From Swiss-Prot:
GO biological process, one term: cell population proliferation
Keyword list, A-Z: Developmental protein, Differentiation, DNA-binding, Homeobox, Myogenesis, Neurogenesis, Nucleus, Transcription, Transcription regulation
Lineage: Eukaryota, Metazoa, Chordata, Craniata, Vertebrata
Protein species of origin: Rattus norvegicus
Disulphide-bridged cysteine pairs: none
Protein name: Transcription factor LBX1
Known DNA-binding region: 125-184
Basic and acidic residues bias locations: 1-20
Amino acid sequence: MTSKEDGKAAPGEERRRSPLDHLPPPANSNKPLTPFSIEDILNKPSVRRSYSLCGAAHLLAAADKHAPGGLPLAGRALLSQTSPLCALEELASKTFKGLEVSVLQAAEGRDGMTIFGQRQTPKKRRKSRTAFTNHQIYELEKRFLYQKYLSPADRDQIAQQLGLTNAQVITWFQNRRAKLKRDLEEMKADVESAKKLGPSGQMDIVALAELEQNSEASGGGGGGGGGGCGRAKSRPGSPALPPGAPQAPGGGPLQLSPASPLTDQRASSQDCSEDEEDEEIDVDD
């Protein structure tokens, strides 16, 4: 194509060309001149050969994966003669495959690595608690009664005396002060709740506590004999009288009002006896 276009060129254009264009090529150049048209560049045998070799390399690589045996010598020689472009492509594919495998292993947690390649920080192991002996606890409690805070000299003395370290003594006193603070807060809360109940509620609580103690001491109150008459019938509005009730000024027993608990107990015993007398027993013939 270039020769025909040059033949058809006008004679004026031939005159405009410089005399350097008519010079022959140098004698020492053995390589032929390469035409710069698109068709000539695409039709170069070296490019075709590189593409064909690249395709053959891919085919041989696929056959190597599926075939049980190794490649023949001819195939290996063909792979060794591939172009640098094919070698670069093969290297990149292997690199990406390796990255995919490492990411999958990290996701599965095989080697303890995260996806970003950072090792998971191990959990901080909790220190074991020091087991104090009874003698050590007794000495520490005795010292804590009159000294809540220790000086460095006292701390060293106690640690040497009980066979403990300074850190153990410091930790024990810190925990003991915290426990004392919690106990005081609980006591304050109990006092506040008792104040809210009022005097009647406090008397009821005291009476219930004394009744529980008496029932535990007497072993259940005589077994509740008489078919349930051992339980006194309480009337509404009659306050319970504690055991340490006040006596009369003369030293004799205190005169109880008709609504007192003792009169209620006597009345309940009479009611129980009347119920027992009036109770009928059915006997089968």
